[in-house]
Design a protein with these regions (language model features):
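Alpha-helix N-cap/helix-start positions at coil->helix boundaries
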Residues: 23-24, 43, 61-62, 81, ...
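Hydrophobic residues within the alpha-helices of tandem HEAT/HEAT-like
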Residues: 33-38, 67-78, 94-95, 109-117, ...
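HEAT/HEAT-like alpha-solenoid repeats
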Residues: 4-15, 42-58, 81-95, 120-134, ...
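A general secondary-structure boundary signal
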Residues: 58-59, 65-69, 103, 136-137, ...
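Short amphipathic alpha-helical segments enriched in leucine
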Residues: 19, 30-41, 53-54, 71-72
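Long all-alpha helical scaffold domains
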Residues: 104-107, 112, 143-146, 155, ...
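N-terminal "cap/leader" segments of large eukaryotic alpha-helical scaffolds
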Residues: 1-32
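Alpha-solenoid HEAT/ARM repeat scaffold
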Residues: 27, 31, 47, 61, ...
Length: 211
C-alpha cells in the first residue's frame, strides 16, 4: 500500500477524479483502479470500491472501456480468490452495453476472474451470470452470453470433471458419467448455448456459430 503523504494525496485525488465532471479525469482515474485498490486495501475495496464501480457503469464509453479492462486486474486486490466473484457484478453490466469494444474487454475480464474461481464459485456465480445474460431482452447481453458459454463449459469440465475415465463423454451421457453439481451445471450451460444458437436475432446466432 501507499506509505507516504505524497502517495496518499495522489490516491485521494484519483478517487475524487472517479466522480469528476471532466471525462478525461474520469478516464485517467479509472485507468488507475488497481493503484487505488492497492492503497485502499482489500476490505475497503470490497466495501467501497467495488460498490462504487457497480454504480458507475452508466458512463461514457471511454470510461467504461477502461473500467472493463481494469476491473479484471483487481483479483489481486480484493482479499483472496474467495472474494473474486464479487468482481463479476460490474463486469456483467459492462458485458451488456451497446458498445462492442467495451463488451469485448468485459468478456476478457470476466474470463480472467472466472479462472480464479473455485468450483463452488463457478457454479454459484458464473453459471447464474451466464443465465442472466442469456435471458436479457437486449441482444448485446445475449451475444456476450454466447461468447462466454464455451469457456465456462470448459472450466466446468476442468474443475468439476466427469468421474468416468473418458472426460470427453458425449453430452447426453455426461450426467450419468459425472453426476452431481458439475454435471447439472454443464447441462445448464449446454441448454443455454442451444437456446442462444437458435436466437431470434441473427447477430446472437452468429456468435454461437463462431464459437
Amino acid at each position: 500500500p501507499a506509505d507516504d503523504d505524497g502517495d496518499y494525496y495522489q490516491i485521494a485525488m484519483l478517487i475524487e477524479h472517479l466522480k469528476a465532471e471532466d471525462i478525461n479525469l474520469r478516464v485517467t482515474a479509472t485507468r488507475s483502479l488497481p493503484a487505488i485498490a492497492d492503497a485502499l486495501g482489500p476490505d475497503r475495496v470490497r466495501a467501497e470500491l467495488v460498490p462504487f464501480v457497480n454504480d458507475s457503469t452508466d458512463d461514457e464509453d471511454e470510461v467504461l472501456l477502461c473500467m472493463a479492462e481494469q476491473v479484471g486486474k483487481l483479483t489481486a486486490h480484493i482479499g483472496g480468490k474467495q472474494h473474486a466473484h464479487e468482481l463479476l457484478v460490474p463486469l456483467e453490466q459492462l458485458a451488456s452495453v451497446e458498445e462492442s469494444t467495451v463488451r469485448e474487454k468485459a468478456l476478457d475480464s470476466i474470463q480472467t476472474v472466472a479462472r480464479c474461481l473455485s468450483p463452488e464459485q463457478l457454479t454459484d456465480h458464473m453459471v447464474p451470470l451466464l443465465s442472466r445474460l442469456t435471458l436479457k431482452e437486449w441482444f448485446t447481453a445475449r451475444m456476450s452470453a454466447c461468447c462466454l458459454a464455451p469457456p465456462t463449459y470448459a472450466l466446468l469440465l476442468q474443475l468439476l470433471p466427469p468421474t468416468a475415465p473418458a472426460a470427453a463423454a458425449p453430452p447426453e451421457k455426461d450426467a450419468a458419467a459425472g453426476g452431481g453439481v458439475g454435471a447439472a451445471a454443464r447441462a445448464e450451460v449446454r441448454e443455454m448455448f442451444k437456446k442462444l444458437c437458435t436466437d431470434d436475432t441473427p447477430m446472437v446466432r452468429r456468435c454461437g456459430y463462431g464459437d
